[in-house]
Amino acid sequence: MMKQRLGFFLAFVVQVFSIQLFAYNTSIPRDTATDDTVNIPKDWFLRDPETDHLQGISADKAYSSLLKDKPSKTVVVAIIDSGIDIDHEDLKDLIWTNEDEIPSNGIDDDKNGYVDDIHGWNFIGGKNGNVAEDTYEVTREYGRLKKLYENVEEKKVSKKNKAEFALWQKVKAKYDHDFKSNKDQYDQFKQQYDLYDNAWGTLNFCDSVIRKSMGGKSVMKSSLANVNISNDTLKFAKETLSKVLENVDGDIEVSQFLAELKDYLVQLKEGVDHYSVAVEYGYNLDFNSRTIVGDDPNNLYEKGYGNNDVTGPDALHGTHVAGIIGANRKNAIGIKGIADNVKIMSVRAVPNGDERDKDIANAIIYAVDNGAKVVNMSFGKSFSPGKEAVDKAVKYAESRGVLLVHAAGNDGDNLDKEPDYPSRNLKNGVEAKNWLEIGASSYGADADLVGSFSNYGKKSVDLFAPGVQIYSTTPHNSYEDLQGTSMACPATVGVAALLMSYFPNLTALQVKDILKQSTRKFDGLKVTKPGTTEEVPFSSLSITGGLVNAYEAVKLAESIKPSPAKK
């Protein structure tokens, strides 16, 4: 009822202030804070479908009924992301430490090519700071290809350059469309924010004026008629509030609506900030973040650049991911992560913008060389000009028995038709065997089981995992709900790490197979296909047609004979 009233309230704000608004979409295309009006347990993703009637991963059930008092080994999990708050109360005891490196002595003690890499490495930093924002890959490709083909007619393109020219046409079309779309969204959010910010200020002033005239009492709709007009200011305040509230049913306290309007302003500001970054940095052809790093961006195989600040300027995303995987299950504070015996390695390579292939390749190699058994990769983009370097890193991880788990993305796209990078499909036509692609699911076993934003693909996405309204760690000892395939990915990584910990003789490929074979199926269930209103079989949206489940995975692992240990 309160939200309905706020809707009337906002409508009358527009009427009173006589400003025409654009239609707008308040959905911001990234992993976002969720609507907390849905009353579900904060730890729903750990719960069991049978006992709790929530489509969680049954982690708590696995621990209580299958793993109780069983021994486990510590597993190193690498998180390639925006950075992690390594001092967070629920993570600090689980952060990986490079025991072969002496802190702060300015020497590469372990000779791994990285000086003072105590808790990981930052590939988007330099001697004088860190990259916060960066351009999108489509912007970088647009700038590169524009120099070659902007004024070239297709008929004059040599046979050797036909493929690159076709890429230019694709890149140009996407850049032009996306830049305009983001600029329009920015303008719309900004116009609305300015309108409602002005309205809030005016109405707050009116409320305070009338409140003062009434001896400090709360201003109700019903009390406005009793306000004695003794000056022009009171007259303005009474007329303005009366006009705003005249068609709203029931008696209303103005201060309550002002509080809700303030909350709405926060949402609008989030939109303004997001699209401002996109326009100012993401699609800015003149912006160059690599002056901070000091490397050669065109040298895909350069090593040794970066710094050891594994937290960075904005560790929200990476910290949230880390908590899902392994927040301390034993300290009775905050939340419980999925895996109970992990060390988390922070490898910073993802800015507010698109990650660079060079950094991702180096990040994967760093994780593998320093003992990670599974790597979380909650990022992605539409173009990959340095794919060759990433592919080599993926193959290197495969050769070393390291599992790579990647978020499918949040565009509501079919990845069978719209590729997302990095990918298991290597440039030479070979498919990486150590790869899992993860879509996002929700808490109810109904048409809304799949996250409305999630990418999918019968040939491309392996399975789904909880990614809607996920409560986890955020910087400065805080906790927050976020959603996205970026949350589904660590939910899967957490289960993988759990298996590796309690069944240490299993190989990465065996763990991958167990995760896929043990998914929970939903025979006959039709769900809303992301990005549409069409209902399709849930089984048609991924390879397995199922949700990751820790309990079922542990049961299956107990029945599998491990591969012989290497001598």
Report residues per predicted region.
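Bacterial Sec-dependent N-terminal signal peptides
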Residues: 1-27
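Sec-dependent signal peptide cleavage junction
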Residues: 21-54, 402, 558-567
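Mature extracellular/periplasmic domains of secretome proteins
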Residues: 63-71, 312-315, 336-339, 354-376, ...
